[in-house]
Amino acid sequence: MSEGRRVQAVISQDLLDRVLAIAGTQTILVGGQALAFWASYYRIDEPVAAISKDADFLGSRNDVDRFATGLNGVVRLSDRRMKTPLLGRVEVAISDMEYVHIDVLLEVFGDISQKAIRERSYAATIGTKTFKVMHPLDVLQGRLENVYGIKEKQDEHGVEQLKLAIQVVRAFVLAEASSDRTGANRSVILKHLNRIERMMLSDAGRKIAKRFGVHVADAMEFPGLATHSDFRTKRLPQIVTCMSPARIEELRKAAVLPAQPATSRPTKRPSHRRP
């Protein structure tokens, strides 16, 4: 079978589970599959256009070899002369016609350091196997900066992933608010909202909202904050100006925002003609 006739397939859940078992806690699941993990965790439907074909991990050169050995895959290394975050790629044949890619990265695109991603990552479990996955807010920032800074991501796939990441972060903030660990601590929720606010006010946040109509501010939820007078009168009005009309309407219906005042048509004054 010639190389040119083979096609890249979407990684199946069974194969992904095998990959995650091999990944362990040495690597961190990032990118589109990290987004898919959180969408599944919060029971959010993933649009077909948002599905990622491959799996990306933050890791080391040794991790490339671990994946290749565990999956009986072929290692494809990046040219060292090229400046690329890709340390290596493992190509796994799933049939004579199809293959999938497992990419191991030194860093992710955008203004997020490897150190910060590692420190904020979550440990997750499938069966008896534990692996690490990128923090939901890091996922959102990654999707935003991808659409903003990578031309190939400025398509339906990239935009749908950003929309999905916004939904995921909303679910995450609500879950944090109801958690026994963080729910009683309003400063934890404010910290998350502060980070979303920085994204929405960034050059990426503003330009993506203008060009694609996708508003990062829509990721905000305000559990326990909307009734706080200082927050409601000072910060909330500023945040709302960066939201989509649909999200503003949702918040009005939920009584988080005041209802739109009814507009009345001005009374037409009778004209006076001179006799």
Regions found by a protein language model. Give the residues of each.
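Compositionally biased terminal segments of proteins
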Residues: 1-275
